C-alpha cells in the first residue's frame, strides 16, 4: 500500500486516476484503513442496489469510494436480475430498509426486446416505446413507494455491430436503438429532479467497449461489466452520490507558471509565455484555461495561489490570447508567501473552508506541502500538460447533479460580498453599516419553487448548521405538508445584489414532551449560508419562527446543538439569542430552551417580506 498522509481526509489509493487492479486486490485492507481514520464523521446513507447482473463487486467498490468521501453506506442488494420485480412490486425487506437512494444497475444484457431486420419502422418505434415504458413504470413505482433518489444506468453500446457501421444509422441497428432509448432516459431525467443517470454509455466507451463487456464473465458469473471494470463504474457512481449529499468541492486555487501557461512569467516576460494558438504547447494551455474558465460559469469559485510578483501575474493574465482574465478570479494571491498560507487566507476572506478547494499546480513539491498541511483539500497529480484536463475531469470534484439560478450567479454573489467587506471598512458603527446595505428578506414557509435549493442547502451547509441534519427532497416536501411543522426559508437581497436562498429552519411541535400547561416546539434544523454571516439574517429568521410558534400556541422552543469538526462557530448560537442551556452530554451535545412569552424581536436592520 502506498504511503498516505495521515492528516488527509482522503486516501490517495482511491483518488483518480486509481489503479483498478490494486483496488480490487486490496479492497479489504483499504476498507479497514478507511474506517480507522481519525476524526472522520461519516454521513450514513441507505443505498439499495437493484441489479440486472451480479452486483457484489460493484457494491464493494462503491463502498470504498463512498467511505473515501465521508459517506458510510448501508446496502440492500436485490437477488440477481430481480431489479424490476423489487422496484415494481416491492419486498418486505426493501420496505423495511427504507432506502435513501436506489441504484438500478442494468445494461444491454437486460433489454427484453431488440430490433431485427424483419421489423418495420413502426414496429421498431413500438418496441422502443414498450422498453422505455417498462423502465418508466419502475421509476414511478419507486417514487410512489419510497419517494427517494433514483440513479439509473443508461446503456452502453453493444459489444458487436450486426450491421457494421450502419448499426448506428439504420433503424434496425441495436446501436441506433440504444441511442434512441438513451435519449428517452435523458429526457426523463431533465424533468424529474430526484432521478439521475449513471452514464455508462460514456464510461464504457472511455474504458473500451471490447474490454468492458467480457462474454466469459457474463456467461460464467453474470458479471456486466467485467470484474476489472467495476472500480471505474463504481467511482463514476460515487461521483453522483457524493455530489447529491454535498461532498463536492467549491473552489479552485490555481498556480500560474507552467500550470495556466507555459513558462515562468517573471523570467520569460509576459510576451514570451506559452498561451494562445502560436504552437502546440500554447494550444494545450489555452484549452486548459478554457476548461478552468468554464467552471466559473458553473458557480465554481476561481482563485490564484502563485509564487510571483503580483505585477507579473497580472501581466500574464492580461495576455490578449489568454482565456482567463483577472476578473475571472475572485481572489488573486500572487506573492512569495507559502501557497498553503495563501489558500487558507483566501478561504477566510471568502468565508468557505479550505477543504472546499482543489489546488491545481504542476509542481509536485508545492502540491505535497499544500496536501500535507490543509486537511481535506483535493490536490490532483496533474501529470503533463496534455493530461491536465483528463485528470481534473475524471476526478469529478465538481460533479453536476443540477444547476440552480444560485449556482450560475455564485461568483457574482461572492464578489458582492467582497464589496460589502470593503464598504464595512469605512464604517465605525457596525449597525450603521448593516443599515446602509438596505437589506430586504423574504422569509416564508417552504415553497415548491425553492424545494431543490432548500434540499441542497441541507446537504451542503456545514459551518452554520446546528444539527447537521441531512434531508432528501421527499423529506423536505413532507415537512412542508405536515401541519405539525413550521418550515422557513430565507432569501436576502441588498444594494450589492441578490444572495438567493441562504437560510433554512424547520421543526415540529413535540406532542410527546408537551404538557397541558406547556406546548413544546423542537427546532430540528437551523442552517445558514456562510456568505451572509454577521448580517443579522439569523435574527430575522428567529423573529419569524417565534411569531409562527406563538400562533400554534407554543410556550417553549427547544434548540439543539450537535458539535462537528466544522460547526464550532455556532456553539454559542442559542446562548447569544437568549436561550437557556438545560443539558449537555459528554460529547458536547447541548439542549437549549426559550420561553416565547415576552420574546422581543431582535432584527432591526432587515426589512422582512
Placement of each model-derived feature along the sequence:
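Alpha-helical cap/lid subdomain in secreted, periplasmic
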Residues: 2-9, 35-44, 61, 69-70, ...
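A conserved beta-strand-loop-helix scaffold within acyl/acetyltransferase catalytic domains
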Residues: 442, 446-529
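Substrate-recognition element of Asp-dependent hydrolases with the DxDx(T/V) motif
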Residues: 287-318, 332, 370, 466-471, ...
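Conserved Lys-Pro-Asp/Glu-containing loop-to-beta segment of HAD-superfamily phosphomonoesterases
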Residues: 343-364, 370
Amino acid at each position: 500500500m502506498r504511503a498516505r498522509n495521515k492528516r488527509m481526509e482522503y486516501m490517495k489509493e482511491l483518488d483518480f486516476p486509481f489503479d483498478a487492479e490494486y483496488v480490487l486486490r486490496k479492497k479489504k485492507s483499504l476498507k479497514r484503513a478507511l474506517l480507522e481514520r481519525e476524526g472522520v464523521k461519516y454521513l450514513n446513507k441507505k443505498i439499495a442496489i437493484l441489479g440486472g447482473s451480479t452486483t457484489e463487486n460493484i457494491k464493494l467498490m462503491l463502498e470504498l469510494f463512498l467511505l473515501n468521501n465521508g459517506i458510510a453506506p448501508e446496502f440492500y442488494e436485490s437477488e440477481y436480475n430481480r431489479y424490476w420485480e423489487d422496484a415494481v412490486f416491492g419486498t418486505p425487506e426493501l420496505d423495511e430498509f427504507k432506502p435513501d437512494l436506489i441504484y438500478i444497475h442494468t445494461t444491454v444484457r437486460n433489454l427484453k426486446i431488440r430490433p431485427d431486420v424483419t421489423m418495420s419502422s413502426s414496429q421498431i418505434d413500438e418496441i422502443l416505446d414498450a422498453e422505455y415504458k417498462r423502465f418508466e413504470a419502475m421509476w414511478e413505482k419507486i417514487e410512489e413507494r419510497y419517494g427517494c433518489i433514483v440513479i439509473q444506468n443508461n446503456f452502453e453500446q453493444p459489444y458487436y455491430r450486426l450491421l457494421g457501421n450502419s448499426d448506428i444509422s439504420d433503424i434496425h441497428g441495436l446501436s441506433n436503438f440504444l441511442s434512441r432509448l438513451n435519449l428517452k432516459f435523458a429526457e426523463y431525467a431533465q424533468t424529474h429532479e430526484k432521478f439521475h443517470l449513471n452514464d455508462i454509455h460514456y464510461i464504457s466507451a472511455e474504458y473500451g467497449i471490447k474490454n468492458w463487456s467480457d462474454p466469459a464473465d457474463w456467461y460464467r458469473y453474470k458479471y456486466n461489466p467485467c470484474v476489472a471494470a467495476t472500480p471505474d463504474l463504481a467511482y463514476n457512481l460515487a461521483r453522483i452520490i457524493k455530489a447529491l449529499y454535498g461532498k463536492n468541492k467549491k473552489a479552485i486555487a490555481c498556480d500560474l507558471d507552467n500550470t495556466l501557461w507555459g513558462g515562468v512569467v517573471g523570467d520569460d516576460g509576459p510576451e514570451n509565455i506559452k498561451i494562445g494558438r502560436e504552437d502546440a504547447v500554447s494550444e494545450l494551455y489555452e484549452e486548459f484555461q478554457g476548461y478552468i474558465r468554464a467552471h466559473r460559469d458553473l458557480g465554481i469559485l476561481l482563485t490564484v495561489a502563485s509564487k510571483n510578483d503580483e505585477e507579473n501575474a497580472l501581466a500574464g493574465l492580461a495576455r490578449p490570447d489568454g482565456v482567463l482574465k483577472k476578473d475571472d478570479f475572485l481572489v488573486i494571491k500572487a506573492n512569495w508567501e507559502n501557497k498553503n498560507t495563501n489558500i487558507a487566507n483566501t478561504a477566510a476572506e471568502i468565508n468557505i473552508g479550505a477543504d472546499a478547494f482543489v489546488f491545481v499546480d504542476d509542481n509536485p513539491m508545492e502540491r505535497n506541502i499544500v496536501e500535507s498541511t490543509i486537511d481535506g483539500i483535493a490536490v490532483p497529480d496533474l501529470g503533463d500538460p496534455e493530461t491536465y484536463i483528463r485528470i481534473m475531469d475524471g476526478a469529478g470534484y465538481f460533479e453536476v447533479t443540477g444547476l440552480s439560478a444560485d449556482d450560475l450567479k455564485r461568483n457574482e454573489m461572492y464578489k458582492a460580498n467582497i464589496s460589502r467587506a470593503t464598504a464595512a471598512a469605512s464604517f465605525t458603527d457596525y449597525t450603521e453599516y448593516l443599515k446602509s446595505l438596505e437589506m430586504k428578506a423574504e422569509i416564508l414557509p417552504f415553497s415548491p419553487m425553492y424545494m431543490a435549493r432548500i434540499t441542497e442547502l441541507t446537504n451542503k451547509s456545514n459551518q452554520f448548521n446546528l444539527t447537521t441534519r441531512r434531508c432528501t427532497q421527499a423529506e423536505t416536501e413532507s415537512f412542508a405538508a405536515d401541519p405539525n411543522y413550521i418550515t422557513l426559508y430565507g432569501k436576502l437581497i441588498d444594494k450589492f445584489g441578490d444572495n438567493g436562498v441562504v437560510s433554512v429552519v424547520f421543526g415540529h411541535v413535540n406532542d410527546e414532551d408537551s404538557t397541558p400547561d406547556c406546548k413544546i416546539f423542537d427546532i430540528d434544523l437551523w442552517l445558514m449560508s456562510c456568505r451572509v454571516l454577521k448580517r443579522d439574517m439569523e435574527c430575522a429568521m428567529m423573529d419569524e419562527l417565534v411569531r409562527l410558534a406563538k400562533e400554534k400556541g407554543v410556550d417553549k422552543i427547544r434548540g439543539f446543538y450537535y458539535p462537528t469538526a466544522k460547526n464550532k462557530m455556532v456553539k454559542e448560537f442559542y446562548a447569544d439569542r437568549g436561550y437557556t442551556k438545560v443539558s449537555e452530554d459528554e460529547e458536547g451535545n447541548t439542549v437549549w430552551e426559550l420561553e416565547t412569552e415576552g420574546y422581543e424581536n431582535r432584527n432591526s436592520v432587515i426589512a422582512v417580506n
